[in-house]
């Protein structure tokens, strides 16, 4: 099995990194690294424990997983089916407006649109050019499904579309003259409302509340149980809107749902299932790689107090960028996420105030010659961080001729300083305001650190201007992504974290600041998430313009990180207690279990 760990060629984006981790820069090794356990002394009596459960994933088991349905025959079949779908898109002019839109929507939800990005963009561009900046106003209930779907798809792809297209429908809603029993149209309208920006008052105040109420009434109406598929779609939409969902998990759900549709396309369904299995195989190779890396570091085995969550750390990256050709990027970001998890646990749980000051200074100075100033358990952590980040920087320098290590260093230093602020708040019993808490918490949630490493790994040509804006925390889309991640985390984890000893989270800060109940505070935080999505939608539209510094793919990945947070924390602390929060089941579904092929 060793060949799976070392010899398997990673799936990579750039040819020059094909030997990633096979030839590495010289590593620094501490003399005491062969056995690095936390110091056994009376000081340990003052240390806290997170009481985290062990990993749900055995390393040997991970090395053994494979998709039995992926073979040369299926790869050839996918190629043939892909050509058929491509032909459908090329001959789309013979289809109606609604048929074109539904085909694009199906391709996206089935997870295969990445094969046809140019064709899809051409179709949507034609829609936009034909209609002008404002689509015709929808004045008939029977046109609502097509108009709402077009609105959502165009906005999702960065085209400017005004909410005014719904003015006639809004007038009917407000005058109680809207008449339609087509729940499909209402669900489509509901989903479209989540592409709103902060200036879209009609979507916020009229359309979303109306559509939500209509869907709830449909779900609650026992006489509607005859249409099981529509009922499932309605419940699914109310649970989390499509725009906020983790794309890959949605794909797995929709493949099953699509086959139940009366008008489903047989070869499109087959194409989606085969493609899912092939992509899953790429993800399985990634998991084997990062699991071997984690085992080699000894962080999980030697630092008993940290969360052993390498699979969950990798799972985050599938939510960020799932396409098979980006395996190198997923592996890099998974390693970054694993290091973040370890360091977070040191600051949150184990480190003393004095030790945390030392570690923060060490990361800020990035001086390996001062390693002996750290306690033994911190040496292993810092040395691993030092080696991995320098190796990543070396890869970028070789491939892209730019030294990004100073930017990486600053990002990690800022993260550790944010962790230290929270540790001091907890130690001193300080209760920050919501504003003060969030100014620090959007950094301490680690999204800026993850995204700067993503940017350097992904970008073919790295811009110093963008790097500077990222490390200076000037990119609003990063702040928005981090804010959603922080608030989703707070809603799911704050009770457990407070019980074991941690700084107040946004819910408790708002309760303390305003005197409201916990239920009211949680509602307020949920509203903060919704408002932040509006900001992020605006940033995504801005990024679609040619003058934008950030690529659309970077912005989409930042949004995907926010989506992933709502998946990970939907049912509780998916990172700390993955089995209780249904994350183990979701990992099993996406990374282990293939889709059976007839």
Curated annotation (Swiss-Prot):
Pfam families recorded: Terpene_synth, Terpene_synth_C
Protein name, entry field: Beta-myrcene/(E)-beta-ocimene synthase 2, chloroplastic
Keyword terms, alphabetized: Chloroplast, Lyase, Magnesium, Manganese, Metal-binding, Plastid, Transit peptide
Pathway assigned in UniProt: Secondary metabolite biosynthesis; terpenoid biosynthesis
Origin: domain of life: Eukaryota
Cofactor binding note: Binds 3 Mg(2+) or Mn(2+) ions per subunit.
Cofactor(s) the protein requires to work: Mg(2+); Mn(2+)
Organism listed in the record: Arabidopsis thaliana
GO biological process: diterpenoid biosynthetic process; monoterpene biosynthetic process
Residues noted as binding (2E)-geranyl diphosphate in the record, renumbered to the chain: 307, 344, 348, 486, 489
Organism phylogeny: Eukaryota, Viridiplantae, Streptophyta, Embryophyta, Tracheophyta
């Amino acid at each position: 099995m060793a060949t799976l760990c070392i010899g398997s060629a990673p799936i990579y984006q750039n040819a020059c990194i094909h030997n990633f981790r096979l030839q590495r820069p010289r590593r620094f090794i501490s003399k005491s690294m062969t056995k690095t356990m936390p110091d056994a002394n009376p000081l340990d009596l003052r240390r806290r424990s997170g009481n985290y459960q062990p990993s749900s994933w055995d390393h040997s088991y991970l090395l053994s997983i494979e998709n039995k349905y992926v073979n040369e025959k299926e790869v050839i079949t996918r190629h043939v089916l892909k050509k058929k779908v491509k032909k459908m898109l090329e001959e789309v002019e013979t289809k109606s407006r609604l048929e074109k839109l539904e085909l694009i929507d199906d391709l996206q939800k089935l997870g295969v649109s990445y094969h046809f990005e140019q064709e899809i963009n051409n179709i949507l561009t034609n829609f936009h050019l034909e209609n002008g900046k404002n689509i015709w106003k929808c004045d008939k209930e029977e046109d609502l499904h097509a108009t709402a779907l077009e609105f959502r798809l165009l906005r999702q792809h960065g085209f400017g579309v005004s909410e005014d297209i719904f003015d006639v429908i809004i007038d009917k809603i407000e005058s109680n003259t809207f008449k339609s029993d087509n729940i499909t149209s209402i669900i489509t309208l509901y989903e479209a409302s989540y592409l709103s920006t902060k200036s879209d008052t009609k979507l916020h105040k009229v359309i979303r509340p109306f559509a939500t109420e209509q869907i709830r009434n449909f779900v609650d109406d026992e006489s509607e149980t005859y249409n099981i598929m529509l009922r499932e779609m309605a419940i699914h939409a109310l649970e989390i809107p499509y725009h906020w969902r983790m794309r890959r998990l949605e794909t797995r759900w929709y493949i099953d749902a699509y086959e139940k549709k009366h008008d489903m396309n047989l070869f499109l369904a087959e194409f989606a299932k085969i493609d899912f299995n092939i992509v899953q195989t790429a993800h399985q190779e990634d998991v084997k790689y990062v699991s071997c890396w984690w085992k080699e570091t000894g962080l999980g085995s030697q630092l008993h107090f940290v969360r052993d969550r390498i699979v969950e750390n990798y799972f985050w990256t599938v939510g960020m960028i799932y396409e098979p050709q980006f395996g190198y990027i997923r592996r890099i970001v998974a390693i970054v996420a694993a290091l973040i998890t370890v360091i977070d646990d040191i600051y949150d749980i184990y480190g003393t105030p004095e030790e945390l000051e030392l570690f923060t200074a060490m990361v800020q100075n990035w001086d390996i010659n001062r390693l002996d100033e750290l306690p033994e358990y911190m040496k292993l952590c810092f040395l691993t961080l030092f080696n991995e980040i320098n190796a990543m920087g070396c890869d970028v320098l070789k491939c892209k001729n730019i030294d990004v290590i100073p930017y990486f260093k600053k990002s990690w230093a800022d993260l550790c300083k944010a962790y230290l602020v929270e540790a001091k708040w907890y130690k001193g019993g300080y209760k920050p305001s919501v504003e003060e808490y969030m100014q620090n918490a959007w950094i301490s949630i680690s999204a800026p650190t993850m995204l700067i490493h993503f940017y350097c790994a992904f970008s073919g040509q790295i811009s110093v201007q963008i790097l500077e804006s990222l490390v200076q925390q000037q990119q609003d889309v990063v702040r928005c992504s981090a804010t959603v991640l922080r608030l989703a985390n707070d809603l799911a984890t704050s009770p457990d974290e407070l019980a074991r000893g941690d700084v107040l989270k946004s819910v408790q800060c708002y309760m303390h600041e305003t005197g409201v109940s916990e239920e009211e505070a949680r509602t307020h935080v949920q509203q903060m998430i919704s408002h932040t999505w509006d900001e992020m939608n605006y940033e995504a539209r801005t990024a679609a313009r040619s003058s934008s510094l950030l690529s659309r793919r970077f912005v989409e990945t930042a949004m995907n990180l926010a989506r992933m947070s709502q998946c990970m924390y939907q049912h509780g602390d998916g990172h700390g207690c993955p089995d209780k929060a249904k994350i183990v089941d979701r990992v099993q579904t996406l990374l282990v279990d293939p889709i059976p092929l007839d």
